[in-house]
Amino acid sequence: MVDNNKTVDNNYKHTSVLLDEAVKGLNIRDNGIYIDGTFGRGGHSRLILSQLGPEGRLIAIDRDPEAIEAAKQITDPRFSIVHGPFSDLAHYVRDLDLVGRIDGILLDLGVSSPQLDDAERGFSFMRDGPLDMRMDPSRGLSAAEWLMKASADDIAWVLKTFGEERFAKRLAKAIVERNLTQPMTRTKELADLIANASPFRDKHPATRSFQAIRIYINSELEEIERALDGAHEVLAPEGRLSVISFHSLEDRIVKNFIRHHSRGPQVPAGLPLTEAQLRSMGGRTLKSVGKMMPGDAEIAENPRARSSVLRFAERIGE
């Protein structure tokens, strides 16, 4: 998620990645019910609200307390915000008795620019701050706490699995040895240690490690899988799913999810079956509507958009 909305927070000024395209892919209906699963600073939510009619409804979700504070600036009666992880979206929808009535769900994955740019959140190796990295600072272990408790093998696994870090074992050993003598509590301490321990100089050596630790601390990939399953459960017939991912691990999950639910049962070629008959066999429930990537102009304006991929799917009607 790279979400920077000019009208919400004066401290962060740039535009949400693929803003128009992601919302257009929802195929907004005047009286529809929509979910913005990753409110951030409200860029997508505001655009959705601008396209809804008086009877429309938008439910936003975010687990970041700062996003919840930003959402309080929206006083539109069609809008509501839920403080919690987007992986629980099906639970929220069940509580509202709206299962099967959601016309569109937008998910903008990963960490937002306000989170990256705020040194106190501890997400960035470019800014010195507390070594935290939690999306919701009130829950779970901080990055510093986890690195103090974890074994070298566990740290290496995280760096390799979620950061595709080729020097994972070397870096993990250096982290554990440093924490035994002088525990790290600041992002700069970790970034400097990784830079000194890594022979890789193509880009900042800490890039992959910070990504990996952040993904692990926040259970990001598991959260995505649960959110997608929840979206599949609650979407109305012909309801749309619009998902923006920012690295290959995220996009692979989204792509495989859409592919899995778009694949019908294996039946002999030429056998005349209707969509309803195929569904009764436990088959196809989604169809892919395509994918998009940012153009050169958007990347030039917002370099963080470079790796983003937007994928669309539609719930097959009953």
From Swiss-Prot:
Protein location: Cytoplasm
UniProt-listed Enzyme Commission number(s): 2.1.1.199
PANTHER family per record: 12S RRNA N4-METHYLCYTIDINE METHYLTRANSFERASE, S-ADENOSYL-METHYLTRANSFERASE MRAW
Gene Ontology terms, MF aspect: rRNA (cytosine-N4-)-methyltransferase activity
Source species: Yersinia pestis (strain Pestoides F)
Record key words, sorted: Cytoplasm, Methyltransferase, rRNA processing, S-adenosyl-L-methionine, Transferase
One Pfam entry name: Methyltransf_5
GO cellular component, one term: cytoplasm
Assigned protein family: Belongs to the methyltransferase superfamily. RsmH family.
Protein name: Ribosomal RNA small subunit methyltransferase H
InterPro entries: RsmH, SAM-dep_MeTrfase_MraW_recog, SAM-dependent_MTases_sf
Transmembrane segments: none
Main enzyme class: transferase
The keyword Cell membrane appears for this protein: no
BP GO annotations: rRNA base methylation
Gene (UniProt): rsmH
